[in-house]
Every structure is written in structure tokens, then in C-alpha cells.
Design a protein with these regions (language model features):
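N-terminal membrane-sensor/transducer module of prokaryotic signaling receptors
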Residues: 2-9, 14, 19-152
């Protein structure tokens, strides 16, 4: 009898832990926008050089759950990203897996409205699958600061 009760409790704990773990690592669009607002405040307070150093840090201040801040210049060159392989690359004309030139959309949006949302498809590093993503971007001087969330 006790073995069945203990087994039942262990199964319940495992199920609860699994459900919690699945939702824990997923950021929302609202959280992504808030990260951009915080990143812009950091940029204004500490300057571009220090801000980009912080954006580039794996597990730095601007990485949380599956969210991370990244930044382009006004020509689509990646200036800040936790993946060092992307830094310095001009990605303006590089499409997503469905052919959308989303970085062009980001630059156009920043130049026309200053801030807003861009949607596209991107490789989710947590699931290793191409997934729909929505990214909030805001222009500050010569930088476009962005953070995106994967959509369910």
C-alpha cells in the first residue's frame, strides 16, 4: 500500500516538474519588448561600447530564458549578439527560411517609425526547430536594438 502511495506521489511530482520546465524557458512578446526598453536605458546610461559588450555576453544582463537582446546598425550589420559568429556580418539581404528579408524590414521600420514589431521564421536554439518569431525593435541613434519571442 505504501509503495503505491509513494509511487503515486513521485509520478505527480514528476508530472508537475515536467509541466513547469516546459513553460519556464519561454519568454513572451511583452517580456521581449521590456528587455528592449531596458537595453535602450542601459545604452543611454553607459554608451554604445559598453552596451554592445553587455549584449554580446552569453548569459549576460540581456539574456533571460530564451530571450536575448541583439542590435544592428542602420545598414543591417550585426553589432550586438550573444553569438559571436554573427557580430560584424551584414545580414540585411539574408532571408529567413521562407524567403522573408526580415532584417530589411527591421531597418525600414526603425528608419520610418522608430520602433515596432517584425515577424519572421527563425531557428529556435532551445528546440533546434524553425519557428515563428516576433521581434520588437527600437532605434536609438545609429543602433537598432531588438529582442524577439518565439510564438506558440
Amino acid at each position: 500500500m505504501w509503495k503505491k502511495i509513494i509511487l503515486f506521489i513521485l509520478i505527480c511530482l514528476f508530472a508537475a516538474g515536467s509541466a513547469h520546465a516546459q513553460g519556464y524557458g519561454v519568454g513572451t512578446p511583452v517580456e521581449a519588448k521590456n528587455m528592449v526598453v531596458q537595453a535602450i536605458a542601459y545604452l543611454k546610461a553607459y554608451g554604445e561600447e559598453k552596451a554592445l559588450q553587455e549584449f554580446n555576453k552569453p548569459n549576460g544582463k540581456f539574456q533571460w530564458r530564451d530571450l536575448y537582446v541583439f542590435a544592428y546598425d542602420l545598414k543591417g550589420v550585426m553589432k550586438g549578439h550573444p553569438n559571436p559568429k554573427l557580430i560584424g556580418r551584414n545580414l540585411y539581404d539574408e532571408p529567413d527560411s521562407k524567403g522573408k528579408l526580415f532584417r530589411k524590414d527591421i531597418v525600414d521600420l526603425a528608419n520610418s517609425r522608430g520602433s515596432g514589431w517584425v515577424d519572421y521564421t527563425y531557428m529556435n536554439p532551445m528546440t533546434r526547430q524553425e519557428e515563428a518569431k516576433i521581434t520588437y525593435c527600437q532605434k536609438d541613434g545609429d543602433l537598432i536594438v531588438c529582442c524577439g519571442a518565439y510564438l506558440p
